A protein has these predicted regions:
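Conserved glycine-rich Rossmann-like NAD(P)H-binding loop of the short-chain dehydrogenase/reductase
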Residues: 29-45
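Active-site helix of classical SDR
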Residues: 118, 157
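Residue(s) in the substrate-gating loop at a strand-loop-helix junction
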Residues: 141
Length: 239
C-alpha cells in the first residue's frame, strides 16, 4: 500500500461500544467508513476521529436488515481492505419464553445482514485481496462457542455466524481474503447492562472486558503479517 493510497476499512456497529472502539484503533492506519443506524451517534464518532489521524472518515447510516437500502449504501465502494462486522443484537430467554419473532430478529441482524453485506462487498474485498490482501473480521461472542441456559436464540445465531465465517474463510482464501472470528467474553457495553438486568444481577463493569481490549484483538488480526492467518481469537476477562 503506497502512502498515496491508504487502506480503507468499513466497520458496522461503529456508533458505540466495540464498534466505536475498533474505529478508534484503526483510525491511525486506515481511512474509515463508519456504519450504523444512528446517524447522530455516527457523526459524533466521526467528529472525534476527524483530525485525530491522517485518514479520511465518513459515515454510512443504514438499517442493515433493509436489503434494498443496504445495497444502495454499499454500491459505490470499489475497493475495501478491511470489513469489520461489529453490529449485533442480543435478546435472552429460555426456549419456552422465546417467540418466533425474537428468533427471526436475532438471525436477521446477527447472521443474514452480515452475510448479505459481505456478499455485496466481496468484489471490493477481492480487489484489495489480489493487491496485497484483505480482511474480514466477525465480532462474534463467547456464546458462539458455548450455549448456556437462557441464551438459546442468541447463541444459535452466534454459532451460525461462526459457521458462516468458517465457510467464507475456505471460499475466499484463494482471493487473498482472510476471515477472523473474534469471540469476546462479557464486555462492558450497553448490551451487557441489559444482560445483567435480565439476569437480575448488580452491574459492575470492572468485572468485564473493556471494548478497547476487544478492539485490540481486531487490530491484531488485521495487522498480522500476510503469511499468518488468525482464524479465531478468544478474548476473556482476566480473573
Amino acid at each position: 500500500m503506497t502512502a498515496s493510497h491508504r487502506p480503507l476499512a468499513l466497520i458496522t456497529g461503529a456508533s458505540q461500544g466495540i464498534g466505536a472502539a475498533v474505529a478508534r484503533q484503526l483510525a491511525p492506519r486506515y481511512d474509515l467508513i463508519l456504519g450504523g443506524r444512528d446517524e447522530d451517534r455516527l457523526a459524533a464518532v466521526a467528529d472525534e476521529l476527524t483530525g485525530a489521524g491522517p485518514g479520511a472518515v465518513r459515515t454510512l447510516a443504514v438499517e442493515l436488515t433493509d436489503d434494498e437500502a443496504l445495497a444502495g449504501a454499499l454500491a459505490g465502494i470499489e475497493r475495501l481492505d478491511a470489513l469489520v462486522h461489529s453490529a449485533g443484537t442480543g435478546e435472552l430467554g429460555t426456549v419456552e419464553e422465546t417467540s418466533a419473532a425474537v428468533w427471526r430478529r436475532q438471525f436477521d441482524v446477527n447472521v443474514v445482514a452480515v452475510a448479505e453485506a459481505t456478499r455485496l462487498l466481496l468484489p471490493a474485498l477481492r480487489a484489495a485481496g489480489s493487491d496485497g490482501g484483505a480482511d474480514i473480521v466477525l465480532v462474534n461472542s463467547g456464546a458462539g462457542i458455548t450455549a448456556k441456559p437462557g441464551w438459546g436464540s442468541y447463541a444459535a445465531s452466534k454459532f451460525a455466524l461462526r459457521a458462516f465465517g468458517d465457510a467464507l474463510r475456505a471460499e475466499e482464501a484463494a482471493h487473498g481474503i482472510r476471515v477472523t472470528s473474534v469471540h469476546p467474553g462479557r464486555v462492558d457495553t450497553a448490551m451487557q447492562r441489559a444482560v445483567v438486568a435480565h439476569e437480575g444481577g448488580e452491574y459492575d463493569g470492572s468485572r468485564f472486558l473493556r471494548p478497547e481490549s476487544v478492539a485490540a484483538a481486531v487490530l491484531a488480526a488485521l495487522t498480522a503479517s500476510r503469511d499468518a492467518h488468525l482464524t479465531e481469537l478468544m478474548v476473556r476477562p482476566q480473573g
